[in-house]
């Protein structure tokens, strides 16, 4: 706790918060072009082949983004929309690709949590 004379000498400093997704530049989403689509292995103790893409954003950044859901149609030069949100077991992956927008197709045959994966409502006969 500072004394009165310490406060007279210099005012209290505001705490500056560091953003968790700097490449978005305070926007909710950003458009970008895939430069490389590949799989990556997670940290211990998990084991898988996670689908990720290297994306060059309109803000000028080049970032690694996760492709959620089962199966995807992305390749080099695909135009994608990115949102923030890290993948805990993939170091350096701080963004998610939004499914069902631009060149990214929604997940096929998805029944639950459809809005998160850009899937259309199933046809009921």
Swiss-Prot record:
The modification 3-methylthioaspartic acid is found at residue 89. Residues 1-28, 104-125 are annotated as: Disordered. Keywords: Methylation, Ribonucleoprotein, Ribosomal protein, RNA-binding, rRNA-binding, tRNA-binding. GO terms for molecular function: rRNA binding; structural constituent of ribosome; tRNA binding. GO terms for biological process: translation. One of its GO terms (cellular component) is small ribosomal subunit. The keyword Transmembrane helix does not apply. The keyword Endoplasmic reticulum does not apply. Part of the 30S ribosomal subunit. Contacts proteins S8 and S17. May interact with IF1 in the 30S initiation complex. HAMAP family: Ribosomal_uS12_B. With S4 and S5 plays an important role in translational accuracy. PANTHER family: 30S RIBOSOMAL PROTEIN S12 FAMILY MEMBER. Belongs to the universal ribosomal protein uS12 family. This is Small ribosomal subunit protein uS12. It comes from Prochlorococcus marinus (strain MIT 9515). The gene is rpsL.
């Amino acid at each position: 706790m500072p004394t009165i004379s310490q406060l007279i000498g210099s005012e209290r400093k505001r705490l500056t918060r560091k953003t968790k997704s700097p490449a978005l530049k305070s926007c909710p989403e950003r458009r970008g072009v895939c430069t490389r689509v590949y799989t990556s292995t997670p940290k211990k103790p998990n084991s898988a082949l996670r689908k990720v893409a290297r994306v060059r954003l309109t803000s000028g950044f080049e970032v690694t983004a996760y492709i959620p859901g089962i199966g995807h149609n992305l390749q080099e030069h695909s135009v994608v929309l990115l949102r923030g949100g890290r993948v805990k077991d993939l170091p350096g992956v701080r963004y998610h690709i939004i499914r069902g927008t631009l060149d990214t197709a929604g997940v096929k045959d998805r029944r639950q949590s459809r809005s998160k994966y850009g899937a259309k409502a199933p046809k009921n006969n």
